[in-house]
Amino acid sequence: RGGFGGLRQGLDATKMVGLNLNYEKKNLIQLDGSVRWNHSDGNLATKVASENFVSSSGSFANRLSQNYSRTNSWDARFRMEWTPDSMWNIMFRPSISLKKTDGRTISSSAAFNEDPYEYVDNPLDDASIEQLAQEDRVVNKQKTTTISYGDATTANGMIQVNRKLSGNGRNVTLRVDGNYSDEDSKTFSTQDLQYFQLMDMLGQDSTYQAYRYNLMPTKNWGYAVKAVYSEPIANKTYLQFSYQYKYSFSKSDRSTYDFSRLNNGVFDNITPAYRSWESYLACLTEPLADY
């Protein structure tokens, strides 16, 4: 396998803003907190020209893809430790994060039975494809697009209460942990493939298309309760009894809608944009549930 060369050019811009909080009143309370916002934009272009050698003949392929992405996220954390007196210690630690991600990709490719650069400057240009097809030098061409979106919310919390029962280390601790997450992802993808040297039953170029819309909401939550009793039995030696109960719940409801029975190229006039689901769904000839 040989290659004429490839080009990858990408840009990635990031931003971050943060805030920290610290407060302490000795022997009574400690507070720590932070908030972070992060944003990123990505842009990656890939251009590839290659040749595959099989015996004395070769096949040539060109591919051009453009990928865009962006992410916004918030993260907040807090910690409180309170000691109202020498016998009690209470700790509380919550956190929450929010994240949204977007992506869109456009890719074009074509396969040739001769080196296309001997006849045209830009093999993936529509006019070039048409010219090379008339000269029987194009094997197939393909166009794919994808838009994706993700939305995730996550929250966690812990509260712990410790009570000293004596001055020699006897104590009891109760701890409760909880977690919750809600995620939602969507993807709409199109693939249009045309074979120039494979005819259908009507004597026309054979085509293939795959159009899919995927939805995947997921929810998870759970909690845990733990109780611990410590009894000193010797110098720096303790006997500990503990009990823990955990519960968790998870639900994922994935849906896939297949629009491949629509005509080839039905979405050609749509330019992929972030969260542009409605532009695609407006082209449907039947209700979404029928797919």
Q: Could you tell me what each predicted segment is?
A:
Residues 1-291:
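Primarily recognizes Gram-negative and organellar outer-membrane beta-barrels
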